[in-house]
């Protein structure tokens, strides 16, 4: 079962429909998207939450296929499409230690990988770091069939850029909460001091990881 948690249409008429932009984010918990115009004004935002977190990219794809069949807003043409993969299959590697031909080795200590996994990276220029991660290839393929070429990123790349580029001299502790995971980001002096993503099921899990980080 898929519950549509939020569907918000904002009265921003897009005169030139060829200039529509689409942003999509998905995880094991749900799916959301927003459309905007050439000035990046949001025209529509929708969020769907899965009744239970799914445990594989194959099950996410089935959920997305259901949504795409009924969501008319996703059946339009778009000038650009951005896809955000939200998962815990990532790690940060400073540029001075990064070698693209060794990319698989950076995940082996924190993520269970197999030989056929596609491993990619986002270039985080604002902190001289690469964000190495595993995207869900089957979902990328499905979206390519629907929209053609698009840009994709890991959710933590966007989160870190937003928080670090606006940080100041003070110590900041941020929590970004999803249905079954949450990110903790600690910054100071426009630098990253700590980042991790945690799974949780109970409020005790949530409190434990926060206290552990503090």
What name fits each language-model region?
Residues 53-65, 203-214:
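Helical "lid/coupling" subdomains associated with nucleotide-phosphate turnover
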Residues 36, 43-52, 62-163:
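Active-site neighborhood for divalent-cation/phosphate handling
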Residues 28-56, 191-204:
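Short glycine-rich, Thr/Ser-proximal phosphate-binding strand/loop in the N-terminal lobe
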Residues 2-43, 165-191:
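Gly/Thr-rich phosphate-binding beta-strand-loop-beta motif of the actin/hexokinase/Hsp70
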Residues 1-28, 44-59, 71-75, 84-90:
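Intrinsically disordered, low-complexity acidic/Q/S/K-rich activation/interaction tracts characteristic
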Residues 8, 35, 76-86, 194-197, ...:
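C-terminal region/appendage detector
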Residues 3-8, 21, 52-57, 103-105, ...:
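N-terminal start-of-chain detector that recognizes signal peptides
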Residues 2, 123-213:
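Small-residue (GG/TT-enriched) beta-loop-alpha framework at ligand/catalytic clefts
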């Amino acid at each position: 079962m898929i519950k549509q948690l939020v569907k918000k249409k904002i009265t921003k008429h897009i005169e030139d429909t060829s200039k529509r932009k689409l942003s999509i984010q998905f995880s094991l918990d749900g799916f959301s998207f927003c459309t905007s115009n050439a000035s990046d004004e949001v025209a529509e935002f929708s969020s769907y939450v899965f009744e239970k977190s799914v445990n594989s990219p194959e099950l996410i794809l089935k959920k997305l296929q259901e949504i795409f069949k009924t969501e008319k807003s996703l059946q339009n043409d778009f000038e650009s499409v951005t896809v955000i993969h939200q998962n815990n299959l990532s790690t940060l590697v400073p540029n001075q230690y990064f070698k693209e031909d060794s990319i698989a080795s950076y995940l082996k200590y924190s993520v269970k990988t197999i030989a056929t996994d596609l491993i990619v990276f986002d270039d985080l220029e604002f902190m001289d770091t690469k964000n190495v991660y595993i995207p869900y290839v089957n979902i990328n393929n499905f979206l390519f069939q629907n929209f053609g070429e698009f840009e994709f990123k890991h959710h933590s790349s966007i989160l870190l850029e937003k928080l670090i580029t606006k940080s100041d001299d003070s110590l900041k502790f941020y929590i970004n909460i999803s249905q079954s995971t949450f990110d903790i980001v600690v910054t100071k002096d426009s630098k990253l001091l700590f980042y991790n993503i945690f799974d949780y099921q109970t409020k005790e899990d949530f409190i434990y990881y926060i206290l552990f980080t503090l």
